[in-house]
Amino acid sequence: KGLIAACVIGDGEAETGPLATSWNINKFLNLETDGYVLPILHRNGYKISNPTIFGRMTEEELEDFFYGHGWKPYFVTATDTQKAHEEMAKTLDKIVKEINGLKGRATVDHEWPMLVLTTPKGWTGPKEIEEKQIEGSFRAHQVPITITRDNPMNLPLLEKWLKSYHPEELFDDKGRVKKEIRDLAPTPSKCMGKSE
C-alpha cells in the first residue's frame, strides 16, 4: 500500500503475449489497498532483427491504444542526453503528483498514468560501423560491434565506445565501485518500490 514501483518495458518485449496481456493489470488494482506500478514503455523501434509494432505507431495511435486499456500516457521523446534527463525529471514529477492524487480511490477509469519514452535504438553507441548504420537500426541490438581473433579491426572502436562512459570515474584501481558513487545510492526507505 502506498508504494510506487517503476517498471521499464522494451517495445519489443511489450508486444509479446504475456506482456501484451499485462496492459490490463490496472483493472485489478485498488489504490485503497494496493501500491502502484508505473509502466515505462521504452520505445526505440527495433527488436532483434525486426521493427516493433509500437515503434511504427504514431503518438496519437499510442495514446488511443493505451487509453483503450485504461492508461493515461505521458510522452518523452529524446535524442539529446541532457534534454532527456531534464524532460524525464519534469514528466516523472508530474506523474508522481498525479499518482499521489489517485491514492485512496477504489476505482480509477482511464486515469492510470504511464510513460512512453522514445529514444533511438543504440543511443550513445557508435552511429556507424563498417559503413553500416548502427544507431537507430536493428543492428544496435545485442552485439553491435563484431570482433573476432581473425578480424580484430573493430577493437579500437569498442574501446573508444566503452571509454566514453568514463569507467575511471566510477571504479577504483581494484575494479570496485568508488565510495563516492556508492554513497549516492538511496537509503533503504528511499529505494524504488519502497516509496510511501
Regions found by a protein language model. Give the residues of each.
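Cofactor-binding active-site loop characterized by glycine-rich and histidine/acidic residues
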Residues: 1-30
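Conserved acidic/glycine
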Residues: 13-17, 36-196
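Short glycine/proline-enriched loop/turn "hinge" motifs that connect secondary-structure elements
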Residues: 29-32, 65
